[in-house]
C-alpha cells in the first residue's frame, strides 16, 4: 500500500513539473503512516492520501495591528503593520501584483487575503469589496493545473468544499485521494505563536523539532469558518506539513495505537447516529496527549492501554464541547456543531470504550484479517464461549508468528528481519500463555490474562518455523477441536506458505542466480506446506472424503508418492472449498476472496514445487490442467517452452521424462526435441 501511495505522489509531481509556479505537498494518513487499510465491499483494501497544490507565484505577508506589536493604534486609519520578508513599511509604496496581505478573520485559525495596502478597516463591506473570494481562487487553480490524465484508473471525482476527491483503484487497493489548492506562508503565523512558546513539561516535541517546523512556515487553504457570515472570503491555516513531520517522528507502537483506534471508531460509527467525529480530531488529540503525557510513557504501555488512554482523552474533549486545534489552541474545531450532536458522539464513544474488545472483534471480522477462521465469529465466541475465543486467538497468534518469520526471507529485507522476529517471538509467547489459560480454566481472571499478554514482549529467543509448527502440532493434539477447526489451522499455515513462498519472478533470479537458488530451495518453506498436508490428513481426512464424494465432475489427481498424496488431499479441499477457511486460501495475507485467480496460484505453485518436490509439482500441474480444461502435458510444456527461468524449464523436462503416462503422449519427434532441449539447458546452466 505504501508503495502505491508513493507512486501516485511521484505521478502527481511529474504532472506538475511542466506547470509554472506550482509546488505539491503530500499529507494525510497514507503518507503519515497513521492508518490501517479498510476492506471495502469485502474485496478491496482502502486508504487515503491528501495532496496540496501550492501556487507559488503568490506571496503572502501577514498584517499585524499596532496593539499586537506594542504600538498605538490610529483609529481613523486603522493603520496596520506588515510582517515578513520584504515587508512594506511605507503606505505609499506600490504593491506588487503577486503580493497578498493576511488579515485575521473573526474566528481563530482563519484569515482574509487582500492585495490592497494595509490601510482599510476589516469590516464586512470592506472584506467583500477588497478581499479575495476563495471560490474564485479554486476555479482559477483548477483551470491552470491540469490533472485529468492522472485519473485514468480513478472513478469519477466529486467536489467537496475546497477539495476535489477521487478514488484511485489499482489491483486489490483503493486510495481515496483529496486534492486541495493552497498558498504558502513563508513565516509562522502569529495566531500559532502560542504553539512555539507554550510550556512543555514532557519536552515533546523537542526544541529542534519546534524550530524546524516553525521555520518552514505553513499554508492557507480556501475554506472559511462554519461560524462566519463571510465564509466565502475566508481562508484556513493548514499545518499539514508540520503534522507530517510530527507523525513521522512517532514510534511504530504510537502510530499503531492511533491507527487501531481510528479504525475501530470509523467502523463502529457506521451503525450509530453520531456524525461529529472526524479522524482529524483524533490526530489532534494524539498530539495533545503526547505533549501532555510524553512519548516515553506510551512506549512502556501495552497497545490496549494506549488505545484506551487515547480514547478517554478524546472523550474528554467532546465532553467539554471543545476540540482545540493543536497549533492554534483557541480554534475550537467543533464549535459549529450542536450540543445534542456532540452529546450523541460522546455517548457512542463511551459505548465503544466499554466494549472495546467486541468492537475490535467486529472490525477484524469485517476486514477479514484473521488468518485462522473458526466456524463461529469472534464476537459470538467472546459472548458465549470465552475458552473458544482464547483458543482462536492462540492459533491466530501462531500463524501470524509464522508469517513474521517467513516475510523477511520473502522480501529479502534484512532491515526488517529483527523487528519481524521480535514480533514472532512475542506472538509465540502470547500463544503459550493463552494455551495455559485454556487448559487451566478459571485459573486467571480476564484482567490478569491481559496483563500477562501485554508483558510478553520478546521472551522467545531466535524463533524458527519449526518452533512454531511444533507448538501448533502440540496444541492441536491436546485441544481436540472440531474437524473444521483443525482444518482451519492447517489451511491457514498453507495460505501463509502460498503467500510467501519463493518465486522465480524474484528480482535476484538473473543477477545472482546462485544466491537466488539457495533462497528458492530454502527448506523452511517446504517444511510449511508438508506440515500443513500432514496435519490436515491426520485430523481432517473426513473433509477430503466429503469433497471427493460430493464433487461430481471434480478433478482426479493421481500420485503414488506418500507425501504427495497428503498434499493432493489438501489441494482437493482447497479447490473444493467445503469450508470458510478453504475458501480463504487465496495466496494473500490480507484478503479472503480471490475468485478466478486460483489457476494463477496453482501455476506459480507448480513452478516453485518443481525445485523442492517434483511429485507435488506433478499433482499441482494436474490441478492447473483441470482449472484450465487443458491436458497436464500442455500445462507442463508452458513452463518448458515459455518459462523465463532455465532451472524451472529443466526440472519440468525431468518431470515429463519421469512419467510414463506423459511420455506416452509425445510423438517420437517431440521426444527427440525434448531430449535436445534438456541437453541445451544443462549445457547453458553448467557454463553460465
From Swiss-Prot:
Effect of residue 178 to N: Abolished nucleotidyltransferase activity
Co-factor requirement: Mg(2+); Mn(2+)
Catalytic activity: GTP + ATP = 2',3'-cGAMP + 2 diphosphate; GTP + ATP = pppGp(2'-5')A + diphosphate; pppGp(2'-5')A = 2',3'-cGAMP + diphosphate
Binding site for Mg(2+): 48, 176, 178
Matches recorded under Gene3D superfamilies: 1.10.1410.40
Stated role: Nucleotidyltransferase that catalyzes the formation of cyclic GMP-AMP (2',3'-cGAMP) from ATP and GTP and plays a key role in innate immunity. Directly binds some unknown ligand, activating the nucleotidyltransferase activity, leading to synthesis of 2',3'-cGAMP, a second messenger that binds to and activates Sting, thereby triggering the immune response via activation of the NF-kappa-B transcription factor.
Protein name: Cyclic GMP-AMP synthase-like receptor 2
Organism in which the protein naturally occurs: Stylophora pistillata
